[in-house]
Amino acid sequence: MSTSLETPSGASAGPSIVASGLPPLADLVRAGSKRTRVVYGAETSAVEDDGLARANKIKLATKLAIEYKDVQTLPPILQAQQTGPAGPKRPTQPSIAASATAGPNVKLIGGPEAEKASSSTPQAVAEPRSLVKFRHQEGFAAEGGQATSRLSQALMRKKEAREVKPEYHPEWKLTRVISGHMGWVRAVAMDPGNQWFATGAGDRVIKIWDLASGELKLSLTGHISTIRGLAVSDRHPYLFSCAEDKMVKCWDLETNKVIRHYHGHFSGVYSLSVHPTLDVLVTGGRDASVRVWDMRTRANIFTLTGHTSTVGDVKTQDSDPQIISGSMDSTVRLWDLAAGKCMNTLTHHKKSVRALAIHPTEYSFASASSGGNNIKKWKCPEGIFVNNFVGHEAIINTLSINSENVLFSGADNGTLTLWDYKTGLPFQHLKDIPQPGSLDAEAGVFCSTFDKTGTRLITGGADKTIKVYSEQA
């Protein structure tokens, strides 16, 4: 019996498959996709947003409860101190949830309520997280996408308000040139009564000049080498001098004679300073030591060691640190006079420190060396660095400060700069002109001082002259 495989025309093969007992094709596809989702869904599909958000809420709430529980409220003592009269309140800022509706500001720390409020905003949900993060980092504002935010604008305003503007200082002009020395003028000191000043030079002579007329009043001889430092006592009629002959002398200005010698330095003495309130004299020199002397008994009270090269300048004041020294080893040292020990060593300078200056009223001082950023301001007593005085690229030999916050710096190449001491900005540049007959190389400035009024500046230079600059009213 033969079976025909042909199907009648117009008949389909579908009924024959159903008749064989197999399920429909649509049911097979649906069952297969469901099974595939169950088996491979954990590896290929993204984690459900609802579960992730719920986990983040639990994590954040736990962190707030554990880590910030103790600091959410102030202790009773601090809370009582802060319950005093308050000033006018600031205008209330829009809430985080409200700002999220208008822009992409992101709350950094918040509880579940903040998360719930932000998730209820359709714009925040619809916007991709990467775009929100990018806009937050760039600081885009909600109005027009400008690259500034309220926070950055407030910080910029505060920074501008903190900038200190320099004071107005009148110009300074050269008013007198005094000749008389036969060598480089290396030291100058002012009379406490503002009547005369003394100068010392390479000709081994100390000359005393009348401040008003510029006339020579007296010449003192006794040193056998270049005079490097002079100081006049505020409480005694004494003039102190030091020189490269290792000698420190005390001159009685009533008899114009040397009444005391201070022996102890092993090499030339380059600087000295008289303590303003104690009968103490401080000297520094090429033997890398700072020596403290009893003015009356000539005893060497302390020998302060620590520098490894020539001590270029030394200053004293009545408050700590009572002794400040600058050395050719590129350091500035602050000394405790009572203990005879070093309090601090400042190593900011890269080259030799040749000059120091203490502000007459402000609790600070300045130091100078050579190279860039060569003048630095420091705050006492720890010697905290304040700022640089940028703009005088030369070897600075001398610094002076008056009570009107004018800092003067004189350099080896004959350049002079006047600074606003508060801000560190220069307001006038001058050039030392050598006297006729001198070489251009003899334009260096070695010493300087303001008079007691702060309106006249006296400098000594390599052209063997003394120059007086006056403030123009």
UniProtKB/Swiss-Prot annotation:
The lineage of its organism: Eukaryota, Fungi, Dikarya, Basidiomycota, Agaricomycotina. Belongs to the WD repeat PRL1/PRL2 family. The keyword Magnesium does not apply. This is Pre-mRNA-splicing factor PRP46. Coiled coil: none annotated. WD repeats lie at residues 180-219, 222-261, 264-303, 306-347, 349-388, 391-429, 440-473. Keywords: Cytoplasm, mRNA processing, mRNA splicing, Nucleus, Repeat, Spliceosome, WD repeat. Residues 1-10 have a biased composition (Polar residues). Its main location: cytoplasm. Gene3D superfamilies: YVTN repeat-like/Quinoprotein amine dehydrogenase. Associated with the spliceosome. CDD domains: WD40 (cd00200). One of its GO terms (biological process) is mRNA splicing, via spliceosome. It comes from the Eukaryota.
